[in-house]
Structures are given as structure tokens and as C-alpha cells.
């Protein structure tokens, strides 16, 4: 806490860093500081609690259904939580307080991890391998190459190059997510509507935060936390997309089972229905020692 004498005071700060730096300066009294801390704690608690609940829900779905999309989505959300903890400073204070190396590179590594897990989720959820195999291959090999390049920069301690690579990858990742959603929607994937809307929300939130950090638009708590609001909307819409996709799979399975029992043209029961009903009749006859007969004409 700083104390200033009555009247005007001049306070000079010199800050230098290779990373993007947010330095909002405000003079607050003790009550205002306590209120700001309380608002920050509640807002981050709500954000992390909501995302952790979605992670737990999708992990349970993956355990029961073995759908890769649910696992990829959980990894994507977990990566965003770690990234948020890193760039807000919480991870540096709680998880690696004594590691200057991790403090320098954790945000950049997690930015790349977010792009990689997001593209992996998009590839599986949109099933790009079936209707856009070239795009699927490009996303898979391109994301791996970007990860390897960033790891090389970190190991060689090329901080400036790693910084540019991470930010460029996140920007490209956002555009690729929108492009993948649009292409899948063009190919008739109904669930892609939710995916496209979700990625647009995330992109808008990220853009507002970036513009605020760069000084293009006014910097305030709303514009700075726009990325958090965007990810909340994105996570909600993607959860709806996964639920819609699961409902589609259930309807397709029920339809396949119905077609396996009944001929769609004649409406007559087919072999599977005969075996199911005949097996039950046979078991009843054996249990009660009754004779049965079948007419093959």
C-alpha cells in the first residue's frame, strides 16, 4: 500500500517485457480494493466452477459411451482453465511460484495447447475425416508441426520467437475453427450450426480482449474479461452441440434396430424379429415341457 501526501503527486513506472503486458493503473482506498478482490474471486469462481462441471459431465459421458468427442472437449476445457490461471497470474502464484522459466513460457505453451486440443475436438466432433479428409490431414499435421516448433523455441530459450509463434497459432486456430464449422455446415452437418455459433462467440470474446489490450478500444473489466464471457457462451453452445449429436446417434441406432426387425416395404417381421420372438417361445416351451410346431409354407 502506498501513502501520498496531500496535493498532487507524480508516480513514474518503467516496465519492459517481451510478452504482451497488461498494466491497468488505478488508485483505490482499502474498501475499494476489498470490493474489487471480492468481485474478482466470485467471478473467477463461477467461471471455473461452470467449466469444471462441464468437464466432469463430459468425462462421465465418455466413460459410458466411449465417444472421443467428449474426451477431447474435456481436455479443451481443462486447457483453457490452465491458460486462464496462467495469464491471470494465479498459476504462477499457486502452482509454480519458484520457477521463473515456467512463468515465462507457461502461457505460451498453454496457448498452443489450447489451439491443439481445440482443433482435435473439431476434427472428431465434425468428423472431418469423412467429408473433408484433406482439411483433416492438414489440421492434424499442421497442429503437430506448430507444437514441435514451439517446444523447440522453448528448449532453445528463443522467447521472442516463441511469443510470436504462440500468438500467430491462436489467431490461425480461431479462423480454422470457424472455417471447419462453416464447411461442415455446407456439407449438411446439422450439429455444425451449434459448433459454428460457439466458435463465433469465442472468437468475438477473444477479439474484444485483444483489442482492449492493444488499446484500440477502451480497457475496462468488461472488455478485458470478454474472453471469459466468450468461452462461457462457447462452452454452453458446444455442450448443446454434443447433446444434439448424442441424440442423433440414439435416433439412428433405434431406427437401425427397427429396420433390422421389420421390412420397411412390406411391414412384415424379418429374420431378427423371428429369432427374438422364436427364442422366447422356445424357452417357454422348454421350461413348461410343452410341444411347439412351426409351419414353413
Give the predicted meaning of each segment:
Residues 1-41:
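Soluble non-transmembrane domains of integral membrane proteins
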Residues 38-61, 168-181:
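First transmembrane helix
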Residues 56-75:
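Juxtamembrane interface at the cytosolic side of transmembrane helices
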Residues 66, 78, 122, 266:
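Conserved hydrophobic/aromatic pocket- or pore-lining residues that grip, position, or stack substrates
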Residues 72-76, 136-139:
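Cytoplasmic-side transmembrane-helix entry/capping segments in multi-pass membrane proteins
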Residues 82-124, 129-256:
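Interfacial "cap-and-anchor" motif at the non-cytosolic start of specific transmembrane alpha-helices
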Residues 256-276, 297:
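Conserved nucleotide-binding and Mg2+-coordinating catalytic segments in signaling enzymes
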Residues 277-297:
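Active-site-proximal structural segments of metal-dependent nucleotidyl cyclase/transferase enzymes
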Amino acid at each position: 500500500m502506498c501513502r501520498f501526501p496531500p496535493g498532487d503527486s507524480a508516480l513514474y513506472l518503467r516496465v519492459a517485457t517481451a510478452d504482451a503486458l497488461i498494466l491497468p493503473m488505478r488508485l483505490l482506498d482499502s474498501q475499494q480494493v476489498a470490493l474489487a478482490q471480492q468481485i474478482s474471486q466470485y467471478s473467477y469462481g463461477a467461471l471455473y466452477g461452470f467449466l469444471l462441471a462441464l468437464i466432469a459431465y463430459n468425462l462421465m459421458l465418455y466413460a459410458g459411451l466411449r465417444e472421443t468427442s467428449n474426451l477431447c472437449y474435456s481436455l479443451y476445457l481443462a486447457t483453457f482453465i490452465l491458460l486462464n490461471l496462467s495469464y491471470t497470474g494465479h498459476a504462477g502464484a499457486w502452482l509454480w511460484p519458484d520457477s521463473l522459466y515456467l512463468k515465462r513460457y507457461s502461457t505460451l505453451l498453454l496457448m498452443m495447447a489450447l489451439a491443439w486440443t481445440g482443433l482435435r475436438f473439431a476434427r472428431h466432433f465434425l468428423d472431418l475425416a469423412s467429408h473433408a479428409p484433406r482439411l483433416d490431414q492438414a489440421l492434424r499435421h499442421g497442429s503437430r508441426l506448430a507444437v514441435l516448433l514451439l517446444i523447440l523455441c522453448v528448449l532453445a530459450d528463443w522467447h521472442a520467437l516463441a511469443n510470436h509463434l504462440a500468438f500467430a497459432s491462436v489467431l490461425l486456430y480461431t479462423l480454422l475453427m470457424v472455417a471447419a464449422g462453416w464447411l461442415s455446415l455446407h456439407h449438411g452437418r446439422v450439429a455444425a450450426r451449434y459448433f459454428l455459433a460457439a466458435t463465433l462467440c469465442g472468437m468475438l470474446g477473444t477479439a474484444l480482449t485483444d483489442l482492449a489490450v492493444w488499446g484500440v478500444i477502451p480497457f475496462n473489466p468488461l472488455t478485458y474479461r470478454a474472453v471469459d464471457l466468450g468461452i462461457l457462451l462457447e462452452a454452453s453452445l458446444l455442450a448443446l452441440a454434443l447433446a444434439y449429436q448424442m441424440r442423433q446417434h440414439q435416433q439412428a441406432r433405434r431406427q437401425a434396430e427397427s429396420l433390422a426387425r421389420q421390412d420397411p416395404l412390406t411391414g412384415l417381421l424379418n429374420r431378427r424379429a423371428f429369432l427374438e420372438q422364436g427364442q422366447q417361445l422356445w424357452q417357454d416351451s422348454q421350461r413348461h415341457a410343452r410341444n411347439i410346431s412351426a409351419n414353413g409354407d
